[in-house]
Amino acid sequence: MPGDFKGWHSRGFLQHFDSPERIQHLVFRTKDSLPSAVLAALPSDSRAKRRIVASWLDRGEGTAILLSAAVANIVQQTLLHFDGARYRLMAWCIMPNHVHAVMEPLDGFPVGSTVRGWKAISAASINRLNETSGPVWARDYFDRYARS
């Protein structure tokens, strides 16, 4: 595995696969998109966990800050900023409480670092716009690499 790419790894909640030039579907969500009671009751089975999380995300729970055109524009501009330099962004969809992105990481720029960058940069801008502080995004993200 070249550079800083980790292959299969986990920070305790979700398994991730990080590899250069491997197309990834990524989903990251706002901090308040899932009620804490739902998070606490998530099963350990990863397939069931993904199904429950997806169901709750589709409900648009939380403050749904991404419904704001100004906030959604911040997220979109953040996604586009390093397109072609650190990754190849193929598609994205900004939902009321989560974001989907399909991208291919370029050598030297692991997926985890890219997602952390997207979250940090967009959160700072969103907090500045809304005159708020604190976390905007949930800690983890979901990824699935495209199989050929």
Language model feature labels by segment:
Residues 1-148:
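Short catalytic/metal-binding and nucleic-acid-binding patches
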